[in-house]
């Protein structure tokens, strides 16, 4: 076999390995469309079942968790009503919560919910609960009464 042919096969194998690894990682992460769908499902659940039952389901149930997607449910004062990944955050006032670059994550989400009713925040950094690493993230938020639900995607 020609040495240049062997090198081309080797390089092709390396490229294929990286592509498959990237596809596997993408499959482990929720998409923007999936985040929006989960948020809309959460808003419908709140309207059908009330905020208390919804908060319990978002925090402790399984129907609003999918890979790295989960619900954050906060009032417009920044109080965490439910959190699908970290129940210790429930009841905490998080209005002043900043990412490592100084971005006020909750304030950004409240601004989108109040001014647009629904939409995406700008990117910020947050610890991914599945990888335990700090990653870029954006959150889709949707207003429900004087609160909002949010579902973020890691990038």
Name these PLM-found stretches.
Residues 1-155:
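N-terminal membrane-sensor/transducer module of prokaryotic signaling receptors
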